[in-house]
């Protein structure tokens, strides 16, 4: 019985040191702000656009390590002449030392009137959805 206790103690000690040796990677990265604008410089916060504008999505992050991924998924939710919830495009980037990132979506033709959205993912998790209109 005493031999079993010693073996269990040795196994627990080995497990404890193994767990301590493993590096825990917990990110505190978060999106502090996200908004849409037709302005390339990122100024303004818009929810209504005209059909000839480029959509800029500005995303501000905090505590993001250099390997954090951000993804913007653009969708036509309820738009004239297209199926509901039509996927338009997506863009993904990996953060470096910056804390502000801009995604954009443009069209060679006029954007059809209707409801759109852009979903912002951080490290594969949906963090924010911005809805907007084209009139």
Task: Map each language-model feature to its residues.
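Bacterial N-terminal signal peptides that target proteins for export
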Residues: 2-9
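C-terminal motif of bacterial Sec signal peptides marking the signal peptidase cleavage site
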Residues: 18-21
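Contiguous segments within soluble domain cores/interaction surfaces
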Residues: 23-115, 119-131
